[in-house]
Amino acid sequence: MQLYAIETGHFKLDGGAMFGVVPKALWERTNPADQYNRIDMAARSLLIEDGNRLILIDTGLGNKQSDKFFSHYALWGGYDLTSSLTKVGFHPDDITDVVFTHLHFDHCGGAILKNKNGIYEPAFKNARFWSHKDHWQWAVEPNVREKASFLPENIQPIQESGQLNLLDSSATPLGFDVLLMDGHTEKQMLPVIEYKGKTIVFTADLIPTVGHLPIPYVMGYDTRPLLTLAEKSAFLKTAVEKDYLLFLEHDAHNELISLKNTEKGVRLDKTFTLDSYFH
């Protein structure tokens, strides 16, 4: 097995939305804001090469939206999904499986392209798409709070592709299991990957950045914030006890981290890249 960090594109989001009720004076210590109160964000996917399978976890925002849409997110950094795949020696047609931790647009947008005729089509024509069945139902019949994150131009083409597979438990046929979390959205899936003697958890939107390690630091986007608090507390307790490494999807400056116990709770120990840790 070989793992690759795939940068699909950096963007910015409102810091207040990303930290909910936590005062800016606290969260900006780890996540400094620009003049518009926006913080740096990554959309970092994980590519798993395992035998004859090439599995991509999440796909970023994609590039099919309008300039007006992207103007709200201040894209920066010059990364894109296809170029990042090429950099590690692969083509979108090589991907055998795409796992969506959940279907918010910044996690699944890169799975669908708009072709030269204006038609939406899969970016990974040879891949199977994987979502949790309860989350899929949540996305196709969205609540008012999340509706703006479940874009029809993402969801409908995935549904019509004939490539969609739905999971109904934490076990998967992909060589790894997932943790199911319901605080951010219904049945968010966090892949748990055994790699070179270590356990790596793709933390998606449970812990989007290092700044979200303190238990009360919960996103304003979460549908069930009290549940997020409980899920994060239990997860971090296990993670530090079992010496997990966390792969951060949204932290533009920290890719892979280890944890330690402190008098204030579980906090950052060290930060790495996949390459620096395993090579």
Model regions and ranges:
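Conserved beta-strand hairpin/beta-sheet module of binuclear metal-dependent hydrolase folds
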Residues: 9-87, 190-205
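Extreme N-terminal starter segment of soluble prokaryotic enzymes
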Residues: 1-2
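Short, P/G- and charge-enriched loop/turn segments at secondary-structure junctions
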Residues: 31-36, 117-118, 178-179
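Metallo-beta-lactamase
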Residues: 76-90, 94-106, 121-180, 185, ...
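Active-site metal-binding loops of divalent metal-dependent hydrolases
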Residues: 8-9, 59-62, 103, 134-135, ...
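Metal-dependent catalytic neighborhoods of phosphoester/phosphodiester hydrolases
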Residues: 108-119, 258-259
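Cap/insert and terminal regions of metallo-dependent hydrolase folds
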Residues: 72-83, 196-199, 203-279
